[in-house]
């Protein structure tokens, strides 16, 4: 018997009730009651605008990482440039380009989709669109960073060193982990195909 396609399946269960039970500065919490497999279920989840992120790789196959404070985990975290889809009508690709410029003062001639992910599907509807940026150059504008972005460090690291840090558990930001492993897998696959 052949295996089914490996693909997430969208469903639209019968929704009995949906209400916003908390309004926050950045996201809200919704409570929804719905029917699934004959049962009436109630679930709370973070209602999120979504985000875009960018894995920037320079001509030396080095990956751009930024270090930024994240209060929820009380840590300065290595990440890739990312930001909320909070500008009405802004496309994920445009958001990724904006974040690369705002957080790292860089622009990319090539910005291709890399991977799309749900960050925590058991408790949030957030979707993150991750792009692969190449052919990098200095941006035309310098941004004044404030709050947690005020002391961002932006450095390029060899891809192999970043992959090693991921598998050793030294960096844990899931957007960075997903992006770097996807890019690494694509590069390995490309090398195998060309042998």
Predicted regions and their residues:
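Acidic, metal-coordinating catalytic segment for phosphate/diphosphate chemistry
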Residues: 17-53, 58-60
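Structured adenosyl-cofactor binding patch, chiefly the S-adenosyl-L-methionine
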Residues: 177-186
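Unchanged
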Residues: 41, 50-53, 84-174, 194
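Generic C-terminal helix-cap and adjacent flexible tail
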Residues: 185-195
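Extreme N-terminal tail/first-helix region
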Residues: 1-23
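Conserved Nudix-box catalytic region and its N-terminal flanking loop in Nudix hydrolases
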Residues: 10, 46-48, 52-98, 146-148
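Short beta-strand-to-turn element immediately C-terminal to the catalytic PLP-Schiff-base lysine
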Residues: 57, 132-134, 183
């Amino acid at each position: 018997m052949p295996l089914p396609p490996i693909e997430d399946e969208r469903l639209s269960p019968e929704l009995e009730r949906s209400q916003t039970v908390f309004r926050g500065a950045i996201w809200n919490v919704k409570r929804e009651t719905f029917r699934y497999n004959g049962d009436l279920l109630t679930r709370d989840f973070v209602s999120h605008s979504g985000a875009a992120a960018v894995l920037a790789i320079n001509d030396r196959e080095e990956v751009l990482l930024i270090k930024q404070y994240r209060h929820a985990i009380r840590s300065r975290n290595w990440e890739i440039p990312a930001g909320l889809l909070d500008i009405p009508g802004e496309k994920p690709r445009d958001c990724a380009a904006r974040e690369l410029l705002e957080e790292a003062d860089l622009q990319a001639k090539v910005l291709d989709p890399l991977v799309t992910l749900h960050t925590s599907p058991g408790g949030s509807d957030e979707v993150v669109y991750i792009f692969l940026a190449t052919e990098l150059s200095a941006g035309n504008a310098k941004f004044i960073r404030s709050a947690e972005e005020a002391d961002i460090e932006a450095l390029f690291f060899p891809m192999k060193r970043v992959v090693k840090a991921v598998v050793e558990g030294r960096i844990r930001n899931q957007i960075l982990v997903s992006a770097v492993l996807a890019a690494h897998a694509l590069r390995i696959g490309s090398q195998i195909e060309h042998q």
